[in-house]
Amino acid sequence: MTLTACGSTSQGTAGAVPRIADVGTRAFEYNTLSDLTTHASAVVVAEPTGKTSTKPFPYGDAKSAPTPYTQMRIVKVVAGVLTAKEIDVVTPGDDISTGKSALLTSKSYLLFLTPAMYAANDPAGGYAVVGGPAGTYAQQGTADQYVKVDTESPALPASIKLGATAIPAISKSETQILNEGPH
C-alpha cells in the first residue's frame, strides 16, 4: 500500500464542530456509548496534525476511489490500549462547511477507534472511527468538553465531559476485533 501526502498543514480551531452530510445508509445504529465501545479497541483524545493521505483500495480497479486518512496525534487514551503517538484515521466524512476532512475542523476530538480493515483478518492499516460520525465528538468550550458530530444518531449523548461522563470499558483487543471483521 502506498500513502500519498496531501497539502494541508493547518490545524483546526477550538470550538469548531464539523458538519458531515450523511449520504449513505447505516449498517448499524449506535444508541449508547456502550454500543460504540463494543466495537472499539480504544477511545482517545486526539488532535489533527494537519496531514492527510490516501490509500488505494487493493481489491478495486484503477478507477476505485482511494480511502482518505487524516493523521492524528494522540493526546490521551481514555479507554482501551493504543501505544502509538500518531496514527492515521480513516476520515469519517468531509465537513460540508469546508469541503475538507471533518477531522481537520476542530482542534481536538474524542474518538472511538477500531482497526481499519477490509474484511476479517485483513487490516487496511491505521484506524477507523466506530460508526464514522457516530464515534466522533469534537472539542467545544473547555478542554474536557466534547460535542456530538453525528446528526443521525439522536440517542447518543449530545456531549461528553471527560471525568464526568462515564466511558464504558473496552472489552476487546485489536486482534479480537480484526478476527470478527468489520461492523
Across the structure, where does each feature detected by a protein language model lie?
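A mature extracytoplasmic/lumenal domain signature
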Residues: P48-G50, I74-K76, T91-G93, P115, ...
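Netrin-like (NTR/C345C) domain of secreted extracellular proteins
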Residues: G7-G15, S97-H183
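OB-fold (S1/OB) nucleic-acid-binding surfaces
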Residues: P58-T91
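Extracellular/periplasmic catalytic domains that process cell-envelope and extracellular macromolecules
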Residues: T38, S64, V81-L82, A102-T105
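C-terminal motif of bacterial Sec signal peptides marking the signal peptidase cleavage site
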Residues: T2-A5
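Sec/Tat-exported extracytoplasmic proteins
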Residues: T37-A40, T52, K76, L113, ...
